[in-house]
């Protein structure tokens, strides 16, 4: 078997299995800590990225396409895109949801915008380690390595999106506090997970293409940080409320179908631009 394909399979298996291994370790050791602060959670969070690092160092992949460099100042516009794309997509979706009468923003009036900024800041800082390990697994390793073996761009992003969502399953079902999860979604948990596989594909197109066109993993790390910080307080802290059958589609959080479609459109445009540039190189 080609070593590049072998290494991709290894990281993929670790990605899908590490969370369940973490749960097993917690059960084996009789863990009494909150699940998200346990040894099992550490195994779940770090294994995909660490397996990629090890394969780059010792498995023959090398570091050339790892995206560790910032690619600044020449790549400044990709960092600007990372900062703006989700707030703009969320704002547009927010307006449509309000127009359809399914969204209330009374929480902003009651709590104040300062409270929202404070919550967003806490989440931004609290997400740093998680998003480092996520992005240095998916976009630092899987996306460029799939491209290196000749996988077409859309299939590349579909594969990464499916693995990305599958990695989250133990998080949703075990590590994350159930009440906290329910406060941040607009559907039942099974429906939320089914929709996650749908919305993660166009989201993966945006993340993957931004990573490839910027030649840096730090752009998508920043994008992930912004999405978590801006999105999570909206429902979880009660700043907005989205109700009705259209809620999963038009929630302005990153779990919303419409937001993910906007992500996919931007990602598609980046892909077309990138491939055009490659064709002219």
Label for each model-derived stretch:
Residues 225-281:
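C-terminal membrane module of polytopic membrane proteins
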Residues 133-166, 179, 212-216:
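Membrane-interface helix/loop boundary segments of multi-pass membrane proteins
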Residues 142, 172-188:
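Membrane-interface interhelical connector segments
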Residues 22, 26-82, 95-112, 145, ...:
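Membrane-helix interface linkers and caps
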Residues 1-12, 253:
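N-terminal membrane topogenic signal
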Residues 16, 46, 83, 124, ...:
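Residue-level signature of the transmembrane alpha-helical core
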Residues 7-19, 45-49, 81-90:
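Alpha-helical transmembrane segments
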Residues 20-21, 158, 183-250:
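Functionally important transmembrane alpha-helices
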């Amino acid at each position: 078997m080609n070593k590049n394909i072998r290494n991709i399979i290894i990281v993929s298996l670790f990605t899908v299995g590490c969370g369940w291994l973490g749960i097993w370790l917690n059960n084996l050791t009789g863990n009494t800590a909150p699940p998200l602060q346990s040894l099992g959670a550490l195994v779940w969070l770090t294994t995909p990225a660490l397996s990629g690092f090890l394969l780059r160092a010792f498995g023959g992949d090398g570091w050339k396409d790892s995206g560790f460099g910032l690619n600044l100042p020449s790549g400044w516009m990709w960092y600007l895109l990372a900062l703006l794309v989700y707030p703009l997509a969320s704002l547009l979706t927010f307006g449509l949801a309000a127009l359809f009468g399914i969204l209330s923003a009374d929480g902003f009036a009651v709590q104040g915008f300062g409270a929202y900024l404070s919550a967003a800041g806490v989440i931004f800082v609290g997400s740093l380690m998680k998003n480092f390990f996520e992005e240095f697994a998916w976009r630092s390793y899987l996306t460029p390595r799939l491209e290196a073996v000749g996988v077409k761009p859309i299939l590349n992003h579909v594969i990464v999106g499916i693995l990305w969502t599958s990695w989250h399953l133990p998080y949703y079902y075990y590590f994350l506090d159930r009440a906290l999860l329910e406060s941040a979604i607009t559907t039942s948990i099974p429906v939320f997970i089914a929709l996650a596989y749908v919305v993660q594909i166009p989201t993966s197109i945006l993340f993957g293409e931004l990573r490839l066109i910027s030649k840096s993993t730090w752009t998508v790390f920043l994008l992930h940080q912004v999405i978590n910080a801006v999105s999570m307080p909206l429902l979880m802290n009660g700043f907005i409320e989205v109700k009705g059958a259209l809620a999963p589609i038009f929630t302005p959080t990153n779990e919303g179908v419409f937001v993910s479609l906007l992500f996919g459109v931007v990602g598609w445009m980046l892909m077309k631009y990138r491939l055009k540039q490659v064709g002219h190189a």
